[in-house]
Amino acid sequence: MNLGRKGKPMKISFKKVASIAVSTALVTTGLVAAPAIAATKNLTVETVFQLTSTDPARSFEQTGNMINRALYETLLTYKGGDASTQVPGIASKWSVNAGATEFTFTIDSRAKFADGTKVTSADVVFSLNRLKNVKGNPSSLMNGITVSAPNASTVVLTTEKATPQVLAIVTSPALGILNSKVVKANGGSDAADANTADKALEFLKTQSAGSGPYVLSSFNLTTEVVLNKNTKYWGAAKAGYDKIIVRNVPVNVQRLNVIKGSSSIAVDLSPDQATNLGNKVNVVTGKASNVFFFYLSQNSTFSPATKFTADAKCIEAVRYGINYKKIVRYAGLGAIQAPGIIPSFFSGALSQKDAIVQDTARAKTAFDACGIKDTPVSIGYWGDGGAVNGLNFGSLAALVEEDLRAIGFKPKLTGAPIAVSLPLYRDNKEEMGLWLWGPDWPDSTNYTESFSPGTKVGLRMGWAAGSDSVITNLQTQASTETNAKKRAALFAEWQREMNKRSPLIPLVQPAAILVANKSVRGVQDHPIWKVNLSEIK
């Protein structure tokens, strides 16, 4: 007998008994579903990989910047597509002395790594010294900068001369802060001999050691990199997805996949490819459309026997033999001829009236004077379908080859997969090279400090320190000037002289396009990390 709340017999109808019986049967036979489990929220990003590793001290390519921006946090950073106003990262506040030689940062007391360990100044000192001493491709960012920690929450960066660009430099993902205890326990070193002593590269391919909203799940240099949500993220802007898959996909396939909905974001479409995509995607453009630029470099130490790239007349022949308008037409809507090395996004950029104009007669006269006649000249580039912003390196190289052949050169295209061609270029082993540059930090000094004699790209062209005092003097003045108008004037003059005297020829600035599914929010193009995976929801 069933009793009511007051101890009286409770009447139960036949219908109710039947209902209970049916419900019991459904439960015992497993026909009633268990409470629903929330579906995993994934984001798939497709791009043509420019990637060497996810170790901040060794990664300096666009895809690496995109990934590391989500794994590691820097002292300062930027929001959205902006690259002019720094905002807090690991540092909650900062100050600069009057001479722009001392930069003091206070670490946010809430900042924690993915394992829950508190971020301290010791982690910052270790990370930046490791970057400097590993001597990887981004190590030059720490040139002339000394890091110290007066206490556990304060970091001081010191320079010997005025270096106002330090605040921009510290936003680079290469200056991402690592958990020093974890990295040291897995072979990491920040000692002066870290270029040989540091053994953490392989470890950092298997898991990350940062404080960002995502952690590394898996890494494959040729197929995909997978990130998982950092469930212990300390910041206010939590990860928007449980998992992000960054895939290495050819440009034409990126277009098909984003239309079908099998990917969320396509990174590398050209303006022409970003048309007629249907009503399920958004096309995003940004200021970064004028940040990347393609250029042709000539190596003055490659082949003394031919003396081609060391001869000013040979360089003049190339400079005035190229049909720049044809290249811009190939680059498509939104592209412009690069009038100088510093793109129009930054201070001191040149206008189109300063751009080099093709002069075939002058080019042929210069070619005759340089005296190489039938000597073959090789042009290296990222082959095997390599493309950025929808521009195929091989197609651009073919346009340049056509122009040079028309004035008498015997060019030979020697493109190769990026794993082969990029080291050749960086190690000063290409006679000529067709390459792209995106800023390492968002300031015009990134260009003066990278393309002048004796600098990173200068040395790749065999342009040693002391090769051109005019260029070097302008570079030095621009790097230490703190007055904005004077800086801009120096940057402009430096470029005009580069256009006359350097072994580098700026070609084109392509439009930057991102295509994203309409369900994806927060997609903006950025000049340093292209897509801020941390902001996408």
Predicted regions and their residues:
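N-terminal lobe/hinge region of extracytoplasmic solute-binding protein
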Residues: E46-A98, N129, A209-G210
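Ligand-site clamp/hinge motif
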Residues: T231-N276, S289
